[in-house]
């Protein structure tokens, strides 16, 4: 694969994570071209009172064209309080909370802080506001 093709492919792909326990019962993510990169379970040291102490994280890739529809879907399917999902494209970071979506240029500290502030307002523990962008 040439560098140009690889760059085009990475620019056209989003990569992120969804914690299974953050989804409302009955959630189905059908119709998206999600490709699971890793499926892992791990213990959380200091979960919030409403969070379980063991989480299942699905790390995934999908076509960047699915970013908007996936964000809108997850904004309806994430449980409240205190959960979010996030992903990045080559240029953009996307953070999805219940009923609220944040998009900002990767590396934009102001955009990141706006999303983190909203997360704090929604009850996400500070230590969990640690997504990569």
Task: Show where each model-derived region lies.
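N-terminal, charge-rich interaction modules
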Residues: 3, 7-53
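Sparse, context-dependent recognition of short Cys/His-centered cofactor- or disulfide-binding micro-motifs
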Residues: 3, 43-45, 87, 109, ...
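Short acidic, gly/pro-rich beta-turn/loop elements at beta-sheet edges
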Residues: 26-28, 68-70, 129
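Acidic, proline/glycine-rich low-complexity IDRs
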Residues: 102-133
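Short, intrinsically disordered low-complexity segments
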Residues: 35-106
């Amino acid at each position: 694969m040439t560098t140009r093709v690889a760059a085009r492919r990475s620019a056209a792909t989003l990569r992120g994570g969804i914690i299974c326990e953050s989804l409302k019962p009955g959630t189905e993510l059908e119709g998206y071209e999600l490709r699971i990169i890793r499926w892992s379970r791990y213990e959380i040291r200091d979960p919030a009172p409403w969070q379980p102490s063991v989480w299942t994280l699905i790390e995934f890739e999908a076509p960047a064209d699915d970013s908007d529809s996936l964000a809108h879907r997850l904004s309806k399917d994430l449980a409240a309080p205190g959960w979010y999902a996030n992903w990045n494209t080559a240029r953009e970071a996307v953070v999805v909370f219940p009923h609220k979506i944040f998009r900002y240029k990767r590396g934009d500290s102001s955009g990141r802080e706006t999303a983190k502030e909203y997360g704090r307002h929604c009850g996400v523990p500070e230590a969990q506001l640690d997504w990569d962008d």
